[in-house]
């Protein structure tokens, strides 16, 4: 795991993590957040609907970027304050997701 200082960062630098989302991940997230929406927890009902299976919570997926920013790039001590996203496709249990951050601008320190 690489940790970058401000000086190490440059426009175009990319950091990412990949994670295969498991049944246990979805169950843990459901329990922690209280989001028991049937889309995430009821396989029988979900099979009859648009996605044809349970889907992973979108906010669980969005949270993966915290791993990238807080642990990889720039790394420990980093606190990000904004995140914009658009969910283009559903994520299913056992899908592998890549959460990626790229430096698009580097402002002067201070």
Residue ranges and their predicted role:
Residues 81-110:
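Hydrophobic beta-sheet segments that form the core/acyl-binding groove
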Residues 1-79:
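Hot-dog-fold acyl-thioester-processing enzymes
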